[in-house]
């Protein structure tokens, strides 16, 4: 079976778990490795913490207790984040999360591409497409970013 551009056949083909997670849109491959190392991923009921673990189409893969499937619909969401929200998926300080501003009908697990500070406002992108996120978010993409900064203090021309 070929799904989302990768060959994965339950009879003979296996792929590394972090690659599978990236293709499912859970996170980039590197971020998927961190999920695995932190014990947040299980395969067929067993928590996996070793990189390079191979999986098949028929395996039950959970991230934070939620099932992950290759057939997942890709989502791309642009949000004008207001100041006073954090871009992380969780905040130990209990501050409001930007993802909570997304429509409730978005049931897929999405995460931000890039970050804006808590006090900053502006465009932030959410997706469940790990390859897309890596292409935009990785420094090697060398994408230009533009910021408008307002200051109450005069800024010298130098």
Task: Please give the residue ranges for each predicted region.
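Basic, flexible Lys/Arg- and Gly-enriched helix-loop patches that mediate nucleic-acid binding at interfaces
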Residues: 2-158
